[in-house]
A protein has these predicted regions:
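Short, positively charged loop/turn segments that connect secondary-structure elements
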Residues: 34-56
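Positively charged, polyanion-binding regions of nucleic-acid-associated proteins
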Residues: 3-27
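Short, amphipathic alpha-helical interaction segments positioned at domain boundaries
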Residues: 79-120
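Alpha-helix C-caps/helix-loop-beta hinges
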Residues: 21, 67-68
Length: 255
């Protein structure tokens, strides 16, 4: 069955379907709400939000994800309704426990996906675009700089960084790697961080990070580490506030 409704109704019907089924694949969403074989919208983490969806269906899905109404898994390309776990939480990354949240720069991606990422951010109403950095190519530049970074495994970032922000995609990846449920992952490893009127999930505040293996100086979940860790040292709870990373990260001195 294909739904033929207005924009607001399309969004409402899509959420109703996902809630009733608990999880719905992108292929089924496309069949139900509009297909486009050449369509592909990406989010700001170089992850395909939904291949094969029409523009209208993509807009509705991105809106639901950005509002926290549904949880999108980039691994299984499936939309989940998680009983409001992520409702009312900002999509921006809270990267320091003071002042206002620092947003993830737009398009921290290689150039080949930059254009599609910017289109997705426009559809999301600017979510992920740092209001103090209007240059839309900043993220692409950061990606180029970041490719030159070589970690020295000193462990300082895992010891000094707090809070370590978690987005729904981060939680899903960690859950998949540890082979435990979403709710158990949140209950065991996540905590809410409040900055003024903003709330977001973060790794529970431990020093060093609970996932840091001190004996080997390695991250226990490196393959599924949060985006703020993936983008380190260009993004971190400390560098986001303006502190030069070279002052505490030896490997960042040549960046």
């Amino acid at each position: 069955m294909t739904y033929r409704t207005g924009t607001a109704d399309l969004k409402r019907e899509m959420e109703r379907l996902i809630r009733s089924e608990r999880h719905v694949t992108s292929a089924r969403i496309a069949r139900a709400f509009g297909e486009d074989g050449g369509g592909a919208v990406t989010c700001a983490e170089n992850l395909v939000v939904a291949p094969g969806l029409s523009e209208e269906a993509s807009e509705a899905l991105i809106a639901l994800v950005s509002e926290g109404r549904v949880f999108w898994s980039p691994i299984s390309r499936t939309a989940y309704h998680l009983d409001g776990i992520f409702l009312d939480l900002p999509v921006s990354y809270v990267q320091r426990p003071f002042d206002s949240p620092t947003w993830l720069p737009a398009a921290f991606n290689p150039p080949r996906v930059h254009r599609r990422v910017m289109e997705a951010i426009q559809l999301m109403g600017g979510v992920g675009l740092d209001p103090e950095a209007p240059d839309p190519d900043r993220g692409s530049h950061l990606y180029g700089v970041h490719t030159e970074f070589e970690c020295g495994r000193c462990g300082r970032c895992c010891t000094l960084s707090s809070p370590i922000s978690l987005e729904p995609q981060d939680v899903e990846r960690i859950s998949a790697l540890l082979e435990i449920g979403i709710r158990k992952t949140i209950r065991k490893y996540a905590a809410l961080v409040e900055v003024g009127d903003h709330r977001a999930w973060s790794v529970k505040r431990d020093s060093p990070c609970t996932f840091f293996d001190q004996d080997r100086s390695l991250c226990k979940i490196h393959a599924a580490r949060p985006i703020v860790c993936r983008a380190f040292p260009l993004l971190s709870p400390r560098t986001a506030g303006g502190e030069p990373p070279a002052s505490w990260c030896p490997s960042a001195r040549d960046l």
